[in-house]
């Protein structure tokens, strides 16, 4: 494969790593041409394991025969760009990439109907906009037995660079889809919706009624404001996590991990 040493981030072929915004990388008008940036050898290898197609690679020159060597072999005949650490360090978040980045073709996502048809436990993210939280939620969901994620169209893109990085590549492992329908529509797929919210009629996360449900969609709200009243009112269950020391709630990423752990156990019990 061709290896090109660069001395400027304005070099041909490097704009995808340096100039293009996450919005431009997504390419809504032509999604088949969308691009994802995987950062660090671990995340790149996860993406390759999940079948993503590499477009080009950017790394420090010293990694050509080091951390990037096996990745270069796996990627086949794609352009490889190398530069000094001093040059590449000007890339946003570069210190977290371990010196290796890969531009990859954005994979096609299933429809929410397709995802629901194959799932028993899903998470619905309603207007969750923080990229760090998205990445952390996906990592917990993948690790704790959730089958997939549905995101309202005003949520952050899971393939945002920071979300990919925080998720440690699990955004490529966990099936996800955009949800462009009202939450009650999920009942048509056999799901009971579980809104995570503090309300007078909230039940505990370990309530026996939840254990009896074969298909559950746990609904998490945006940072700060939580779920809108309409989403809570439309839910089949309103659920809270018991707290101590007067603390009323957890960050959405932390709350999701607790919910996934409990619901993952319940899923095993209903198999």
Regions found by a protein language model. Give the residues of each.
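Boundary-proximal intrinsically disordered activation/regulatory segments immediately upstream
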Residues: 1-67, 155-156
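Amphipathic alpha-helical repeat scaffolds
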Residues: 40, 129-137, 250-255
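Active-site/ligand-binding-proximal alpha/beta "capping" segment
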Residues: 195-247
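A glycine-rich helix N-cap at a beta->alpha junction
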Residues: 74-93
């Amino acid at each position: 494969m061709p290896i090109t040493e660069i001395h400027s981030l304005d070099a041909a072929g490097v704009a995808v790593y340096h100039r293009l915004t996450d919005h431009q990388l997504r390419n809504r008008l032509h999604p088949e041409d969308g691009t994802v940036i995987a950062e660090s050898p671990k995340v790149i290898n996860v993406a390759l394991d999940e079948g993503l197609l590499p477009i080009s690679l950017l790394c420090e020159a010293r990694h050509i025969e080091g951390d990037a060597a096996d990745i270069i072999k796996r990627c086949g005949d794609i352009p490889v760009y190398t530069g000094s650490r001093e040059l590449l360090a000007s890339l946003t978040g570069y210190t977290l990439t371990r010196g290796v980045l890969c531009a990859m073709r954005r994979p096609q996502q299933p429809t929410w109907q397709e995802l629901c048809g194959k799932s028993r436990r899903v998470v619905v993210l309603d207007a969750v906009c923080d990229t760090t939280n998205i990445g952390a939620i996906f990592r917990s969901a993948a690790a704790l037995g959730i089958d997939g994620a549905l995101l309202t169209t005003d949520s952050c893109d899971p393939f945002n660079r920071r979300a990919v990085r925080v998720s440690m590549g699990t955004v490529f492992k966990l099936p996800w889809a955009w949800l462009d329908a009202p939450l009650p529509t999920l009942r048509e797929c056999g799901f009971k919706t579980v809104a995570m919210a503090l309300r007078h009629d909230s039940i505990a996360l370990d309530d026996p009624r939840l254990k009896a449900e074969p298909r559950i969609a746990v609904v998490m709200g945006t940072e700060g404001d939580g779920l809108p009243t309409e989403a809570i009112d439309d839910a089949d269950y309103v659920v809270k996590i018991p707290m101590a020391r007067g603390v009323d709630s957890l960050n959405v990423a932390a709350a999701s991990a607790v919910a996934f752990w409990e619901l993952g156990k319940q899923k095993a019990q209903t198999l």
